[in-house]
C-alpha cells in the first residue's frame, strides 16, 4: 500500500540514481567543475526525486502528472550532463551505460506512474 511518496517504486529507483550520481560527482569530477557541470548534474538529479515528492503531495491528479513530467525532463537533462561528462573524459563508457540504464528504468517507471494516475483520475463531470 502506498502511503507516502517514499513507498513509490519510481521514487526508490530514482533516489538510488541520485545517490549514484552524487558519489560519481564527488569522486570523478575535477574541482574546476564544482560550480559548472558538477553543480548542474547534481541539481538535475535532485530535481527528479524532488518533483516526484512534490507531485505526490498535490491534491489533483493532473498536478501530480505535471510534476512527473517535469521529473521526466530532469531525467533526460541528467543524461545529457552525463554524456557531457563522458565527452570530457570524467567518466568512462561503462559508467555512462550503467547510469543510462538506470535513467531508462526511471523513465519507464515514471511513464507507468503517469499512466496509472491518468487511469485513476476521476472523469470530468458532464454539465
Language-model features: locations:
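Amphipathic alpha-helical assembly/interaction segments
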Residues: 1-127
Amino acid at each position: 500500500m502506498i502511503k507516502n511518496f517514499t513507498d513509490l517504486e519510481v521514487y526508490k529507483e530514482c533516489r538510488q540514481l541520485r545517490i549514484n550520481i552524487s558519489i560519481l560527482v564527488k569522486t570523478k569530477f575535477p574541482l574546476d567543475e564544482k560550480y559548472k557541470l558538477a553543480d548542474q548534474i547534481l541539481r538535475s538529479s535532485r530535481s527528479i526525486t524532488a518533483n516526484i515528492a512534490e507531485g505526490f503531495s498535490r491534491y489533483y491528479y493532473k498536478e501530480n502528472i505535471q510534476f512527473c513530467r517535469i521529473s521526466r525532463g530532469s531525467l533526460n537533462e541528467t543524461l545529457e550532463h552525463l554524456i557531457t561528462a563522458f565527452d570530457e573524459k570524467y567518466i568512462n563508457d561503462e559508467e555512462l551505460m550503467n547510469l543510462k540504464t538506470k535513467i531508462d528504468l526511471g523513465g519507464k517507471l515514471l511513464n507507468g506512474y503517469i499512466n496509472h494516475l491518468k487511469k485513476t483520475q476521476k472523469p470530468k463531470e458532464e454539465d
